[in-house]
């Protein structure tokens, strides 16, 4: 019904409704780094972690149009809680939300152990002010605790990417988001 209503507002032009990661995967396959690739995967990083899979030029959606929920593959059994209700999902570690939580944990551990971190000053001692940029900014300034955060984040991201490559064997894998 939404597509039809939008189409009517746009003088009958065709309107398609698509999940953001699938739309990004289509865009990469149509005009981006995956142009001409038979098999490609797009990983979208943001508040969550999404995925779009292109097989033979078409988006893979699964039987219920919910295929490619890559962020909800488990990479840490019994790990961090995820917004989906499960534990250990890739999204809980490699999304911006996951990065914020990893950063908060490292700051809390630094407090307990007496380690100094410039991230404390950046957030004014208020963990609710941690952002996805906090650790990267502090790491660039030479903060060791922040470097540990970034290493952990990248390790989980790489683990998930390796899983995607091993499962799908894409010609092209792209990562984007906002």
Locations of the language-model features?
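A cytosolic small-molecule/anion-sensing beta-strand core signal
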Residues: 19, 55-56
